[in-house]
A protein has these predicted regions:
Chain A
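Glycine-rich helix-loop "coupling/hinge" segments at transmembrane-helix boundaries
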Residues: 207-244, 263
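N-terminal, non-cleaved signal-anchor transmembrane helix
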Residues: 1-84, 91-92, 96, 100
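Hydrophobic positions within alpha-helical transmembrane segments of bacterial inner-membrane proteins
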Residues: 83-91, 95, 99, 124, ...
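Membrane-cytosol interface at the C-terminal ends of specific transmembrane alpha-helices
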Residues: 136-187, 193-202, 253
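Generic hydrophobic transmembrane alpha-helix motif, especially the helices
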Residues: 115-149
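Alpha-helical membrane-interface segments at transmembrane helix boundaries
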Residues: 69-77, 111-118, 200, 204, ...
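C-terminal transmembrane helix and the adjacent membrane-cytosol boundary/short C-terminal tail
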Residues: 14, 197, 238-263
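Cytoplasmic-entry segments and transmembrane alpha-helices of multi-pass inner-membrane transporters
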Residues: 93-127, 156-159
Length: 263, 260
């Protein structure tokens, strides 16, 4: 039987990779102080679970605008407006970042870098900046969501512009159409379903981020949650968590159904 | 000429569906504007003041945030590992081709849907309340967050495997544990590793802000500099976050391409 000859590197490669992974994890675990857990951890966990199973139903609707329904509707309004505005703001960025011609493209490189920066810029910091400009409240949340969403939507929109069939554009130019004709009659109809699909997808994510923006005072359900956690009002925490879970699940389901029909 | 045109009924001719959708969106927008209350003046002075200060980063602050940024990466690594280890059994229980018991399957999937519905920052807030301020809270939040995400990615991968090896092993008399180890795992290892790295990227991004709530990492410095209005230092923190995210994404993308 002939033995397969393997180079030294091929033989030690799996061991080398294992060693690197083990070293990385030894380093990672060394940075986390496991002993720092509070002694009350078990107690608090039980209290939160107890709160989840015995939620404060009275908080659902009070009628003075300080209840769960009101905060959830505000969260949805922030996510919806933010995503809607963002979809329009994104379009120029998407065309800037789309790499539609062969070879190096300066505008696509700049556009893609710009979108990465926007994507990584923490949404909470954006929210705080807008709070400076318009004061605390849901309006600041809307602005933060609409600027932050450009990062991801621009990437997805740009990729769908890159993916379209160029045939119709060339046909319109060949038949004597201007660049504007080629844009409005060929590009826009081709990318519109993808744009709508991604906007809905981004709306699902925006609902999640809008529910945390309240932590810094940018409106929505986050503020009552943090307040309830700080005052150790576990049944209040329970009902708010339940409310968020139901809201996110329903929105994901509805948006998923609409997106299925779009494709 | 008219005869060659396709017949369209009333609803199609007047685009009733599209019209209905547009009116619905318009109503929701009007309602949202009402709710959010966009009548406040936008103060460009205040807004640009922050940018002006951030445009001159305080580089002397950089050494202070190196350690917290590394802690952020450590939290992401440990959280992703714990989340993945938890996700493996659950993803097998949520795959239609492994779990034949419909009841268990739907219970597990329902549970996973609930876990996935909780945003990462809320998990951090809850874990800070449970284990106290520090990186352990971040690890806990990231564990639960990546558990929810990875479980779904994993069970979708398991459901697309080739059933041939599974049937062959079952026919040869293997029990279900042996089938999973020798027929399922080898087929999905590369996809699992790729999804692990993808989740790690998302966790690094998430862990940079978790500290804002006291859950460890560089986010704490975001909170401190912002609340003291030291925007030249905030700029350094943001640049640090940008750098670590770009580096981790780059390494992870490179490895995932090698795995594919």
């Amino acid at each position: 039987m002939q033995k397969v000859n393997r180079t030294l590197w091929q033989r030690i490669k799996p061991w080398f990779i294992t060693l690197v992974v083990v070293l990385i994890y030894l380093w990672a675990f060394s940075g986390i102080d496991m002993s720092s857990i509070k002694e009350t951890a078990g107690e608090v966990t039980m209290a939160i679970l107890n709160g989840l199973f015995h939620p404060d139903w009275d908080f659902v609707y009070i009628g003075d605008g300080e209840d769960l329904i009101n905060a959830l509707v505000e969260t949805l309004a922030i996510a919806f407006l933010g995503t809607f505005i963002s979809a329009f703001l994104t379009i120029p960025f998407a065309f800037l970042a789309a790499h539609t011609k062969r070879g190096f493209s300066a505008h696509a490189t700049i556009g893609k870098f710009l979108l990465t920066v926007i994507r990584v810029f923490p949404e909470i910091v954006l929210a705080l900046m807008f709070i400076k400009a318009v004061g605390p409240g849901a309006y600041a949340g809307v602005l933060a969501v609409s600027v932050h969403s450009i990062g991801m939507l621009g990437k997805l929109f740009g990729e769908s512009i890159e993916d379209i069939d160029r045939g119709p554009n060339e046909a319109i130019v060949a038949a004597g159409g201007s660049a504007v004709d080629s844009w409005t009659l060929a590009t826009i109809p081709a990318v519109l379903p993808a744009f709508m699909n991604y906007t809905l997808y981004r709306f699902e994510i925006a609902v999640r981020s809008a529910s945390i923006l309240g932590i810094v005072g940018a409106g929505g359900i986050g503020a009552p949650l943090i307040f309830a956690l700080q005052t150790r009002n576990w049944s209040r925490v329970g009902i708010i968590l339940l409310g968020i879970i139901v809201m996110v699940t329903v929105i994901d389901y509805l948006s998923g159904q609409i997106r299925k029909r779009l494709v | 000429m008219n005869a060659t045109l396709p017949e369209r009924d009333f609803a199609q001719k007047w685009h009733l569906k599209a019209l209905f959708a547009i009116i619905l969106v318009a109503i929701i927008i009007a309602g949202s504007v009402q709710k959010v209350g966009i009548e406040t003046e936008f103060s460009w002075d205040q807004f640009f003041q922050i940018w002006k200060e951030m445009a001159h980063p305080d580089w002397s602050y950089f050494p202070v945030i190196v350690q917290p940024i590394l802690e952020t990466v450590q939290m992401a690594l440990v959280g992703t590992l714990f989340g993945t280890l938890l996700a493996i059994p659950f993803s097998l229980m949520a795959s239609t081709n492994i779990m034949k018991n419909k009841f268990v399957l739907s219970v597990v999937r329902f549970f996973l849907n609930i876990v996935r519905a909780v945003p990462d920052m809320l998990l951090a807030a809850v874990f800070v309340a449970i284990v106290g301020i520090g990186p352990m809270a971040g690890v806990g939040a990231l564990t639960v967050f990546s558990f929810g995400m990875i479980s779904k990615l994993f069970y979708e991968a398991v459901e697309t495997i080739d059933e041939g090896p599974v049937e062959a092993l079952t026919a040869a008399g293997a029990n279900s544990v042996q089938t999973i180890i020798f027929a399922v795992i080898p087929q999905v290892t590369n996809q699992f590793l790729s999804y692990f790295l993808y989740t790690l990227e998302i966790n690094v991004r998430a862990s940079t802000v978790l500290g804002y709530l006291g859950a460890g990492g560089v986010g704490l410095y975001l909170d401190q500099t912002l609340s003291m209005f030291l925007y030249d230092r905030t700029a350094i923190v943001i640049l640090g976050i940008l750098a670590v995210v770009v580096v981790v994404d780059g390494i992870s993308n490179h490895l995932r391409e090698a795995l594919a």
